[in-house]
């Protein structure tokens, strides 16, 4: 009997060790994916801020990997760009050399996006075929892969909105493109954190997990509002802080009809909403931190709540500086990077309350 129990325990320990080993490998893979996604969003922000997103006027998922290699090919690519309204109305007289600058930004963004597809799909196939992907993760990972493929279509759908009548892409499509990218990033972070060892600290209060989820959701919503701000160049509407046009609430927020359209197409209203959302998010994070410190100051959850508030404070300072400086490229990119850092940490913090995915046996492991 004792021998049988020992054999069972050894078998169980072997299974746990194998699970831990597989999880470390998948976490390493997801860490690379997260880094690549972060880089993609940053390059995408720089592409937008340099007004380079419309420089490639065709969608060639495979052939588009190869850039122009000869003077003739560059001339042909430039001729395609000269057909769209952005060239006619904004860049008339641009040289081929100047065109190359904006072309390389968009090409790099598309190449990085394609590369992430490979970075995600091939290791996933390997882990799947070798039995390293736990059953509970199969559908979520396939969902992320499918969403990534759909994101490629959304990217072209966004670009196409600026090729016919407009000199820029639709703010609605820009927001959709950025939010989907952030959803993919958040989903990868959620799984990555769920595969990581957790402490056994109890939540500071019964509502701590709910509040962490609200902060994460609000962080994503702020990114959506930020995308509308970017698409409308709303960051140039009021370049003062804390007042807007000398008032807390400016008077021309609902000048368009119907009134609801101002929420999406009035640059001043959209900037006001982005500011208001930032204040709300800041207040929620501050309250969450205070409650966590009072209820359980020595826990990992409380320490994470402090770091989350610090990250939000830094992001707010970057946002205000970006506004006051009238959105220079470096600060605009830094603000977008900060938003993704806040979102990623908010997701990880929220997942910390949920805990890691169950193991083959109920054994607490703390690293």
Curated annotation (Swiss-Prot):
One annotated GO biological process: heme A biosynthetic process
GO MF term list: metal ion binding; oxidoreductase activity, acting on NAD(P)H, heme protein as acceptor
EC numbers for this chain: 1.17.99.9
The organism's place on the tree of life at top rank: Bacteria
Bilayer-crossing regions: 26-46, 111-131, 139-159, 174-194, 212-232, 276-296, 305-325, 327-347
Pfam families hit by this protein: COX15-CtaA
Bilayer topology annotation: Multi-pass membrane protein
Pathway per the UniProt entry: Porphyrin-containing compound metabolism; heme A biosynthesis; heme A from heme O: step 1/1
InterPro entries reported for this sequence: COX15/CtaA_fam, HemeA_Synthase_type2
Quaternary structure, from the entry: Interacts with CtaB.
Family statement drawn from the similarity comment of this UniProt entry: Belongs to the COX15/CtaA family. Type 2 subfamily.
Protein name per Swiss-Prot or TrEMBL: Heme A synthase
Designated gene of the protein: ctaA
